[in-house]
Amino acid sequence: MTELDKDTFDQAVLAHKGVYLVDFWSETCETCAAMMPEIETLERELAGEHALAGKVAFGKVNLQGNRRLAIREKVMSLPTVVVYRDGEKVKAFSKEFTASEVKAAVEGLLGG
């Protein structure tokens, strides 16, 4: 999963053609720490599914030092996972959600 910050986000995510999943998190967020392995597993699962391999990119933004970016992207609670398609936000998951819900949304966008 690519580490993103205020200097790399626009080029990596907003200029990306296709689906990009971004995990907004913080070191002080216990729920974020619990969810991170599930999102990393989801990344491996989607990379391993032949039909979806290479069709979705993954990144994460630590809010430490990136609060303005989070505010700009309307991330108001943690953890938050945002799904972008062709640089546009299409779906956001906040606080209580499962990796399965995120996977279903990504597969829906990819027709998988």
Language-model features, listed with the residues they occupy:
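A short beta-strand-turn-helix
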Residues: 2-19
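A short glycine-leucine-enriched loop at secondary-structure breakpoints
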Residues: 72-76
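Structural microenvironment flanking redox-active thiols in thiol-disulfide oxidoreductases
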Residues: 61-70
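The canonical Cys-X-X-Cys-His
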Residues: 29-32, 81
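Typically the conserved alpha-helix immediately C-terminal to a functionally engaged Cys/Sec
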Residues: 31-48
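Non-catalytic, surface beta->alpha helical segment in thiol-disulfide oxidoreductase systems
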Residues: 77, 82-112
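Short pre-active-site segment immediately N-terminal to redox-active cysteine/selenocysteine motifs
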Residues: 17, 25-28, 77
